[in-house]
Amino acid sequence: MTDFRQDFLKFSLAQNVLKFGEFTTKAGRRSPYFFNAGLFNDGASTLQLAKFYAQSIIESGIRFDMLFGPAYKGIILAAATAMMLAEKGVNVPFAYNRKEAKDRGEGGVLVGAPLKGRVLIIDDVISAGTSVRESIKLIEAEGATPAGVAIALDRMEKGTGKLSAVQEVEKQYGLPVAPIASLNDLFILLQNNPEFGQFLEPVRTYRRQYGVE
């Protein structure tokens, strides 16, 4: 059985979603790698991405009744992942929000199935955690319960304090976060694939400087 986390990282490299080199993060840090989930932007890559999400969610063991995708990136993730979960025998409804409320038709900021039961939030990454916090407020305002958060990559980086954005969400809300892959998985990829050997030490140094346990 192959490691789907490694398969996901290799797939991300093939799609140029994951790149090695010298990049500057939003926090102003010099990073030896860059991950841009927005480049999963055609039917085939989105389908494969949704398969990875579905597998990661199932293996996480998180109990949930439906998916919620925060606008905008989470919208397609929720829809596509719901379809792939259905193929695996887990048929759940999904919903998403608008950035601005609509005053005609169905109105409001929520679209899709009513938010009920245990709601799993799905997004690409957790950076500042703003999207997750807003999603939790929406879910709780509808009388539903946040079940956890599914993301593509956990960079495992310290924020302003000693915790990463993912750890802060886990600590503040008591919610499990299920990434398809993490910085640890990326490190394993570099160790096991000599063609990426030149980036092993820069990633090791970056992890030592900014990483969390």
Swiss-Prot record:
Residue positions binding 5-phospho-alpha-D-ribose 1-diphosphate: 26, 72-73, 98-99, 102, 123-131
EC number per UniProt: 2.4.2.10
EC primary class: transferase
Keyword Transferase attributed: yes
PROSITE patterns: PUR_PYR_PR_TRANSFER (PS00103)
GO molecular function, one term: orotate phosphoribosyltransferase activity
GO cellular component labels: cytoplasm
Pfam families xrefs: Pribosyltran
Gene: pyrE
Protein name: Orotate phosphoribosyltransferase
Record's keyword terms, sorted: Glycosyltransferase, Magnesium, Pyrimidine biosynthesis, Transferase
Catalytic reactions of this protein: orotidine 5'-phosphate + diphosphate = orotate + 5-phospho-alpha-D-ribose 1-diphosphate
GO biological process, one term: pyrimidine ribonucleoside biosynthetic process
Source organism (scientific name): Neisseria gonorrhoeae (strain ATCC 700825 / FA 1090)
Coiled coil: none
Family listed: Belongs to the purine/pyrimidine phosphoribosyltransferase family. PyrE subfamily.
This protein's record includes keyword 4Fe-4S: no
HAMAP family, alphabetized: PyrE
UniProt subunit comment: Homodimer.
Pathway(s) per entry: Pyrimidine metabolism; UMP biosynthesis via de novo pathway; UMP from orotate: step 1/2
Binding site for orotate: F34, F35, S127, R155
InterPro entries: OPRT, Or_phspho_trans_dom, PRibTrfase_dom, PRTase-like
Function per UniProt: Catalyzes the transfer of a ribosyl phosphate group from 5-phosphoribose 1-diphosphate to orotate, leading to the formation of orotidine monophosphate (OMP).
NCBIfam families (alphabetical): pyrE
Cofactor(s), names only, from the UniProt record: Mg(2+)
Cross-referenced SUPFAM superfamilies: PRTase-like
